[in-house]
């Protein structure tokens, strides 16, 4: 029976990591929320590490409570802006990957942007309760937010938005896009 289950999972294209996440109760975003795209940035070399970190993790996984909040955010977005949709860049993250990320930023100016895996059990991503998302237009292009994903600098800080507007580092359109994303994710 175990062999048959493994064979079925492998036929469905799921890795051991993805099967493990499902076994502990995490859910696959693409399977649970139609219309939300998944582009796992750490499964590509296009991230702050410059290399593939998620070998065998191409799908986004969340705990059911986080999944429900993402579902509500998606529904709210569809009501407000039919021309936009959500893309998930990151969700549940293996602790071993968090440790690799921390090694790169530890004792640098960038360490405020990566959770220390040795404190409080690591970051929320390690438990499938955090999700990194952005908004894309109908052509699939991310709408301007004032900074790129994985940008580790002041332009990514929401607590500095007023200052960023005043200095011209972000513009009003980018601010409104950020506010829309925050609104749907927190309402």
Regions found by a protein language model. Give the residues of each.
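Extracytoplasmic cell-surface/polysaccharide-interacting catalytic and binding patches
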Residues: 6-91, 103-187
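Segments that shape or occlude catalytic/ligand-binding pockets
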Residues: 94
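Bacterial N-terminal signal peptides
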Residues: 1-4
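A short acidic (Asp/Glu
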Residues: 97-102
């Amino acid at each position: 029976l175990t062999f048959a289950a493994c064979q079925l999972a492998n036929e469905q294209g799921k890795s051991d990591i993805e099967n493990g996440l499902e076994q502990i109760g995490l859910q696959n975003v693409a399977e649970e929320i139609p219309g939300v795209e998944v582009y796992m940035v750490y499964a590509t070399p296009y991230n702050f590490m410059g290399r593939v970190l998620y070998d065998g993790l191409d799908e986004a996984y969340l705990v059911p409570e986080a999944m429900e909040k993402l579902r509500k955010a998606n529904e709210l977005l569809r009501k407000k802006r039919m021309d936009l949709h959500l893309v998930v860049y990151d969700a549940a993250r293996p602790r071993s990957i968090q440790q690799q990320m921390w090694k790169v930023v530890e004792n640098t100016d960038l360490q405020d942007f990566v959770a220390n895996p040795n404190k409080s059990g690591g970051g929320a991503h390690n438990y499938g309760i955090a999700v990194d998302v952005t908004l894309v237009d109908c052509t699939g292009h991310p709408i301007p937010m004032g900074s790129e994903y994985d940008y580790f600098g002041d332009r990514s800080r929401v607590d500095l938005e007023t200052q960023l507007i005043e200095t011209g580092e972000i513009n009003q359109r980018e601010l409104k896009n950020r506010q829309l994303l925050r609104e749907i994710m927190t309402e």
